[in-house]
Structures are given as structure tokens and as C-alpha cells.
């Protein structure tokens, strides 16, 4: 071993308190033991008074001038056993050790740093049978919890932060393992000249773990100087003294996609590039690729720090371009994809059935007499009778026209399509067989309410189970909630959402017709009385007002009949369809399931209930994939092919008259062949 080649020195210190045993001279050692992997440092533990140990200088150099100095010198590495750190060094010993400090008094003098000299250690420490001696303080006086807590919370002793200069060729050594075994030069006063440690860490070196576990000191206030490697020294230094700060407000400069991301500038404080990465074993295989027998290797995705910051900017720009592209596409609104027999105008605000526009004639019959009244009757009545009559007539005309527009051009309560899609018909189903859909009677749980059960039906066109009181209109080709009837004068269905407007329209039209008759007759009679003329001369003077009297009387009859009829239906709690269908059954089997048992309550329920929202929202922007609507715009939809679903609401072109033989195909072909032969 290296310990046998070194010069002979004093092997053991003076034993004062019989703490350290006596060891034979080094020359007596003939056989050297193997290198010790764990350096025993329990002999470095000092006493509380600093005088319980040896006071004889070790090695006899300049240390003889300072008898109180115990282990403050660095000696050659041959006087200590080879560890995993010192065994790697091939440096020769110095002729004379250099003292770190000239004086050390008090309790500080009783501590021997782990970076200090090993020349005072017994020669038997290099043998295989060496057992480190324990002081009485370390063995019989264990550390209490308060001392342990104080030791953990205390700062590093000055011996750890003491700067030093490595002279000679030892000054270029950067290894954590070999730094402790090098020669330390003269002490300097500034911390700025401290050499940075190597790239090793506390958890990646085997010797570091041994030194941390074997060099614990039980004495309060003292710390083993080499229990922790030099890689943590920058962590123990004050932050302000070294001006260490982190800049978090830096922006990344824009780079081209082909430029690789820049790596941070390497400094002496940087970790190595392979930090915490698997090492290679003897066979050259990394730990991540080694064979694991009986285990399962889990796959993991790449970590986010590997993604350069520019990729996030590119992704955000890509999303913006996609959003702009979608906006440019302009998918349109819901009414453009509606599949019903409905026509829309003004961006989906007005809708009407795609049939003969009889509602235009109805509106004309309302607006035309109002215009004639304001031209030929209102000025004279304003000045000769009262201004209240024209104002009241204008208010009634406004209510009538407004309710007409709402009832004719609003959504009556169209139910959404494709809510309960029916499976497609199988090929083996017979087209002449019984229907697969029919009226279904939903039975209630209690037998006492059997009379109030109502049937519901599945609509094959709209592909949904219709709720009670809902029906499919064959003209609108829509299922309407609480449908009353399809009004040809409005060219729209009357359902739950526009029934109140319909009743207001017919009732206001009735009142407006009566008011028109009364105002025009009053104008003629007042003029006759003012001028004392006959009724014929007055009619000859106001011919247009007299014509409006007849027009008002004619237009009064039909709206008045509709008003009385719907007042009767509302009092019964029935719709027009329910009332007409009930006459198919005898009176003993007619039931009104939705009546409130009071005609006032029935009126209140119909006229004062809130208007439900629309199920479609035709003015809303279209979302691609909405199952209620089609996949193409109405004018871009392909032609409907003939199928087993029927021919409802499809335009069928008239068939041309066929000439020639209309028999079977075989006979037709044979007939054509014979005709060709005859012609030949």
C-alpha cells in the first residue's frame, strides 16, 4: 500500500486521557490490508474542553512550534488508508506539510477537519482488522434532540468556507474525490478566489454517501468538515456576497423554424449535461435500455422543456389562421340548413310555408282599408267630430297588423328533427307488410286515471316521438308543438308559440272592422245633419267612406266567426284538431285531458302563459354537425332519390305517355328482335 512507502513518522500521539489506544510502529506492519471504502473518522471527534486528546505535534515539522494544534495540518496521503477517493490519486507526498492556521484555541482546536491531515491516524488504520476508536463523548453521551436540531439548523463552520490555494500542479485538480487528498497551499483572505468544485453531486458519488454516513459528529456545535463534498459550498455562501440572482423577465427572440434552440451559457455552477441520466455499465448498455427480466417497461412521452418556445408561437398562429379560415368560409345560419318546407327572409327573422302566398292577400285586405280611412275620413273626423276616433282607429290597426305579422311570419313551435333516429329498414322487410310505426297508448301506473291517457306517435319524417298534442303538418312538413290547425290565410301553422298572436289578430280584425263601419257611418250622418241634406246627397259627397262601410261589414263576418269559435275552444281547453277528432268517437268516449275544469282558468292558461323559446334558433350561426339540421345548404342539397320512405312533399314530374309493347321484359326484347328482323 501507499502507507508502506512513505517515510516513518510518529505513529501515535501522546495519550493523555487514555482515549486513543497505542499502536505499533509503522515498520512492524508487513502485510497491508485492502483499501477501505469507508473512511473512519470517529477519531476526529474532539472533546468539549479541547484538551482531552493528544497535544503532541504529528510528524514533527512546523507543527512542533504549536503544541496546542491537533490536526490542523495536511500531511501526505500515504499516512492514511486508501479510500475510494484517495486511492485514485497518484500524487507524491510533500516534503513538509503547510499549516492552514497558525493558532487555534478553545474548542476549535479539538476538531480535525476531514480535509485535514491523516498523518496523525494510527498505522493500524490501513490494516484489515482496524477498528476505529471511539471517544467517551461519542459513545457514552449521545446527542439529544435539541442538539441535533441545533446542529441541523446551524450554518457551516468557517473551516468549510475557508479559501485556499492549491500550489504547484495540484492546483488544476477539479475532482470532488481527489480534492480532499491534495496538498493545500497558503491561506488567502478573499472568497472570490475559491476554486469551483467538479460536476459531481452529493448523490452521484459513492464515496460521498460513505463520508456522509460515517462522519457524523455527536458534539453540539461542531461539524465534520469533509462530511459533505465541495459541490455544496456555493449553496452555503450568502447570496448577496456573490451577487447570485435569477432573471425571469427575459423574452425569447424570434428565430426561424430551421434555427435550433440555443442552449444556456455554461458556467462553473452549471450541472453536467448528463446530470441524472442513466450511466453506462461495463457492457456499454445504458440503464434505460438494459434488460429487465420479469418487468414491464413503461413508455413515456417527451417532456415539455424539450419543446422550444417558438413552437408555442407557431401553434398559436396556426390556430388563428384556422379561425380566420373558418370565418371566411361563412357557414351561414341555421335557417339555411333547415330541411322543412319553409321559406325564410330577412336573415331568418321571417318564415312562411312554401305554398301559395295567400297571406299577402290577407295583409292587403287589412292595410288597404286602413289607408283609405286615413286619407278620406280621418282628417274630416279630426276637425269636425273628435281627434280620438282616428287615434283609436290607428291603435287598433297597429295591433291587427302587428299580430298578423307575428302569427304569419314567426315560428309556431317546430320540434327539432332527428332526435330519435329510427334504424334503417332491413332488406328482408316486406313493403306490403304491416307498418312498423303506429299509434302507441302510454298506460299510466294508476288505473283511476285511465280516462286521461293520451296517445303519442312516432313521426317517421321528423324521426322523433312527438309529445302530446303535437302533430305533423303535411303542408309545412314539420312537427308542431300543440298544433291547433294550419291557417291558409296566414300560410303558416298555428301552434303553441303563435296561437296568442293568431287569436289577437282575428279578434282585433273583428273590432277593427266594426270600428271602421261605425266611423264611416258617423262621418256621413254628421255631414248630413250639419248641412241639412238627405242621406243620398251625403253618400254622394263621401263615396269612399260609404264603400268602406260595406267592406267593413264583409270583413267582419269571418273574423267574428273565428273569434267566437276560438273563444269556445279555449273555454273547453281544446285545440281545433282535438275538437274535430273527438267527434269521431261517441259522446260517452270523448275526454278533454288538458282542461282546467274552469273556463276562466282555461282562458288564462292559453292567453297568459309565457311564450316558450324556439327549438331551432334560425338566426343563430350554424354549427357543423348539428343533427337537427342538414349537412348542406338548402340550395346545395342533392336531389332526393326514390326510397321506401314514401313520396311525401316531393315534386313528382308527370310521366310521359309510353308507346309500344308494355309487357314483360323478356317478351319486350323478343318483340323488338322480331320487329328488327321484319324490317331487315
Curated annotation (Swiss-Prot):
Subcellular location(s) per record: Endoplasmic reticulum membrane
Every DHHC domain range: 457-507
Protein name: Palmitoyltransferase erf2
Chain segments carrying region Disordered: 1-128, 246-315, 656-680
Main location: endoplasmic reticulum
Keyword terms: Acyltransferase, Endoplasmic reticulum, Lipoprotein, Membrane, Palmitate, Transferase, Transmembrane, Transmembrane helix
Post-translational modification: Autopalmitoylated.
Membrane topology annotation: Multi-pass membrane protein
UniProt source species: Neurospora crassa (strain ATCC 24698 / 74-OR23-1A / CBS 708.71 / DSM 1257 / FGSC 987)
Gene Ontology terms describing biological process: protein targeting to membrane
Catalytic residues (UniProt): 487 (s-palmitoyl cysteine intermediate)
UniProt family annotation: Belongs to the DHHC palmitoyltransferase family. ERF2/ZDHHC9 subfamily.
Known role: Palmitoyltransferase specific for Ras proteins.
Catalytic activity: L-cysteinyl-[protein] + hexadecanoyl-CoA = S-hexadecanoyl-L-cysteinyl-[protein] + CoA
Sequence ranges on the Cytoplasmic membrane side: 1-361, 406-501, 565-680
Domain of life, per lineage: Eukaryota
Transmembrane segments annotated in the record for this chain: 362-382, 385-405, 502-522, 544-564
GO-annotated molecular function: protein-cysteine S-palmitoyltransferase activity
Domain characteristics, as noted in the entry: The DHHC domain is required for palmitoyltransferase activity.
Any one of the GO CC terms: endoplasmic reticulum membrane
EC number per UniProt: 2.3.1.225
Amino acid at each position: 500500500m501507499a502507507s508502506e512507502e512513505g517515510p516513518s513518522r510518529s505513529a501515535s500521539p501522546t495519550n493523555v486521557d487514555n482515549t486513543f489506544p497505542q499502536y505499533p510502529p509503522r515498520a512492524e506492519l508487513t502485510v497491508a490490508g485492502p483499501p477501505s471504502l469507508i473512511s473512519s473518522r470517529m477519531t476526529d471527534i474532539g472533546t468539549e474542553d479541547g484538551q482531552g486528546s493528544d497535544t503532541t505535534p504529528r510528524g514533527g515539522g512546523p507543527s512542533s512550534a504549536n503544541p496546542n494544534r491537533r490536526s490542523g495540518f495536511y500531511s501526505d496521503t500515504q499516512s492514511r488508508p486508501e479510500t475510494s477517493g484517495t486511492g485514485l490519486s497518484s500524487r507524491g507526498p510533500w516534503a513538509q506539510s503547510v499549516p492552514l492556521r497558525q493558532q487555534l484555541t478553545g474548542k476549535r482546536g479539538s476538531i480535525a477537519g476531514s480535509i485535514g491531515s491523516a498523518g496523525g491516524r494510527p498505522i493500524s488504520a490501513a490494516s484489515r482488522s482496524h477498528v476505529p476508536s471511539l471517544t467517551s463523548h461519542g459513545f457514552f453521551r449521545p446527542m439529544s434532540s435539541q442538539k441535533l436540531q441545533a446542529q441541523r439548523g446551524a450554518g457551516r463552520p468557517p473551516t468549510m468556507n475557508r479559501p485556499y490555494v492549491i500550489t504547484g500542479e495540484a492546483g488544476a485538480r477539479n475532482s470532488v474525490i481527489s480534492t480532499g487528498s491534495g496538498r493545500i497551499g497558503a491561506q488567502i483572505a478573499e472568497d472570490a478566489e475559491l476554486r469551483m468544485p467538479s460536476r459531481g453531486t452529493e448523490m452521484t458519488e459513492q464515496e460521498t454517501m460513505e463520508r456522509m454516513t460515517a462522519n457524523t459528529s455527536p458534539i453540539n456545535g461542531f461539524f465534520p468538515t469533509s462530511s459533505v463534498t465541495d459541490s455544496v459550498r456555493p449553496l452555503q455562501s450568502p447570496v448577496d456576497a456573490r451577487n447570485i440572482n435569477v432573471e425571469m423577465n427575459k423574452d425569447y427572440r424570434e428565430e426561424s423554424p430551421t434555427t435550433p434552440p440555443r442552449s444556456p451559457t455554461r458556467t462553473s455552477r452549471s450541472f453536467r449535461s448528463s446530470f441524472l441520466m442513466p450511466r453506462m455499465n461495463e457492457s456499454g448498455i445504458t440503464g434505460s435500455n438494459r434488460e429487465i427480466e420479469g418487468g414491464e417497461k413503461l413508455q413515456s412521452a417527451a417532456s415539455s422543456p424539450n419543446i422550444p418556445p417558438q413552437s408555442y408561437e407557431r401553434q398559436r398562429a396556426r390556430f388563428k389562421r384556422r379561425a380566420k379560415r373558418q370565418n371566411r368560409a361563412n357557414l351561414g345560419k341555421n335557417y339555411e340548413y333547415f330541411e322543412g318546407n319553409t321559406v325564410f327572409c330577412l336573415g331568418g327573422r321571417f318564415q312562411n310555408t312554401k305554398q301559395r302566398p295567400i297571406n299577402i292577400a290577407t295583409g292587403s285586405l287589412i292595410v288597404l282599408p286602413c289607408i283609405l280611412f286615413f286619407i278620406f275620413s280621418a282628417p274630416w273626423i279630426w276637425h269636425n267630430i273628435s281627434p280620438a276616433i282616428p287615434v283609436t282607429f290607428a291603435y287598433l290597426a297597429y295591433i291587427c297588423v302587428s299580430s298578423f305579422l307575428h302569427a304569419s311570419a314567426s315560428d309556431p313551435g317546430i320540434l327539432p328533427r332527428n332526435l330519435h333516429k329510427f334504424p334503417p329498414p332491413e332488406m328482408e322487410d316486406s313493403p306490403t307488410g304491416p307498418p312498423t310505426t303506429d299509434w302507441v297508448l302510454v298506460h299510466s301506473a294508476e288505473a283511476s286515471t285511465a280516462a286521461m291517457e293520451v296517445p303519442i306517435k312516432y313521426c317517421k319524417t321528423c324521426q322523433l316521438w312527438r309529445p302530446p298534442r303535437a302533430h305533423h303538418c303535411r303542408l309545412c312538413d314539420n312537427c308542431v308543438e300543440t298544433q291547433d290547425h294550419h291557417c291558409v290565410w296566414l300560410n303558416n301553422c298555428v301552434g303553441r308559440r303563435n296561437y296568442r298572436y293568431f287569436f289577437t289578430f282575428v279578434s282585433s280584425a273583428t273590432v277593427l272592422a266594426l270600428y271602421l263601419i261605425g266611423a264611416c257611418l258617423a262621418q256621413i250622418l254628421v255631414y248630413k245633419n250639419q248641412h241639412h241634406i238627405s242621406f243620398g246627397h251625403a253618400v254622394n259627397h263621401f263615396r269612399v267612406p260609404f264603400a268602406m262601410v260595406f267592406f267593413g261589414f264583409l270583413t267582419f263576418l269571418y273574423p267574428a266567426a273565428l273569434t267566437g269559435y276560438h273563444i269556445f275552444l279555449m273555454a273547453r281547453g281544446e285545440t281545433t284538431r282535438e275538437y274535430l277528432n273527438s267527434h269521431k268517437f261517441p259522446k260517452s268516449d270523448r275526454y278533454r285531458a288538458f282542461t282546467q275544469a274552469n273556463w276562466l282558468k282555461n282562458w288564462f292558461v292559453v292567453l297568459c302563459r309565457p311564450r316558450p323559446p324556439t327549438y331551432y334558433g334560425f338566426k343563430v350561426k350554424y354549427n357543423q354537425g348539428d343533427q337537427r339540421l342538414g349537412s348542406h345548404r338548402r340550395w346545395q342539397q342533392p336531389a332526393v332519390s326514390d326510397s321506401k320512405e314514401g313520396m311525401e312533399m316531393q315534386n313528382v314530374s308527370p310521366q310521359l305517355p309510353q308507346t309500344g309493347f308494355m309487357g314483360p321484359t323478356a317478351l319486350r326484347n323478343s318483340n323488338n328482335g322480331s320487329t328488327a328482323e321484319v324490317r331487315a
